[in-house]
Amino acid sequence: MAIELLETSTKGTVPGTGFTKAHQLFRESVRRFIDQEINPYVDAWEEAEIFPAHDVFKKAGDLGLFGLSYPEEYGGTGADYWYNMALAEELARVNCGGIPMAMGVQSDMATPALNLYGSHELKKKFLEPAIRGDAVCSIAVTEAGGGSDVASIRTKADRDGDHYVINGNKMFITNGVQADWLCLLARTTPGTTYKGMSLIIVPTNTPGFSVSKKLKKLGNWASDTAELVFDNVRVPVANRIGEEGQGFIYQMQQFQNERLVSALGAAAGAEKMLKMTIEYCRGRKTFGKPLIENQWIYFKLTELLSEVEFLRQMCYHCGRIMDRGEDYTREASMAKLKAGRLVREVADICLQFHGGMGYMEEYPMARYFRDSRLLSIGAGADEIMLGIIAKFEGIAPPR
């Protein structure tokens, strides 16, 4: 099915974007998958604070959702990145934030560097099963003492012959409980700067690896998040992605895709909340008339819909820059910053307009409100985005 969707026809092209009729057919396939395989079970998975990743990912892999822009040689479809962008928008239809986040880790966070810089053997062993959905993977970068300061990581991988011996801890790792392998950023040479780090594939069945604990979160409950421990974990040097000491650079490169799809998903999710709120305000009557007839309410909803459209178009602009083969770090950082702030405002206003009903867990607004808070923290906090943008604009003070 996935191959059939990847036609190159330009009929039905959306002006100003890279979307074609083929992308629309792909969207419809994703919507059916969400309606049949995810949304009917979301409430139960949220209550359990975990979802069956191997089962869901296998079904997603059968549709080709994890290999859209990856080579056919490794099970991908070799499509343009607009398919990934379409997927990010459609996943906002999932009735929670955790499952789209978990899927995004698989497609846009844990595997891009492996695809670009990994050896053929490494791709066959780890990338191919991830694309098929036969393996769940995770990106293990963040540490408790570092957060967004990636250059400060302390987890180390010491060379011992043809192996690395890994020691350290990772924190707030999405898919960490269920992952079959990790894309780990570790320090392979001593120091405290970004130099000397490497990306290494670590199978989670390796002796010495353990999940210290599954973490409880404010939102995104269905997605498991874990603290990971590496106690003399031995993996072959052949598991290193690319050159030794280049891991930080590789990681920074794949952050841009992560930030772009996060911003696109936020725009689609914010629009979903606003449309839900509009329908609620049309049906809810106070003081003898529908809420939607209050000027403050329909003006505010209109303003936020405009802001969402601006964000969406900024993301599409990133796609056009990518099509030209140019760097879009500045624009992706702007989109990510705007997305985190806007989705929080939308969630807050929409909950307010729902009144007491919005505060009840039995109604989805409470979940969306909780889930929305993460975007200004994960994938680079707002403050990190501001720092990046300031450097591009030439207004950051010299270090």
Q: Model-found features: residue ranges?
A:
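Alpha-helical interface subdomain recognition
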Residues: M1-G97, G104-V105, Y117-L122, P129-D134, ...
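Flexible, small-/acidic-enriched active-site or ligand-binding loops
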Residues: S152, N205-P236
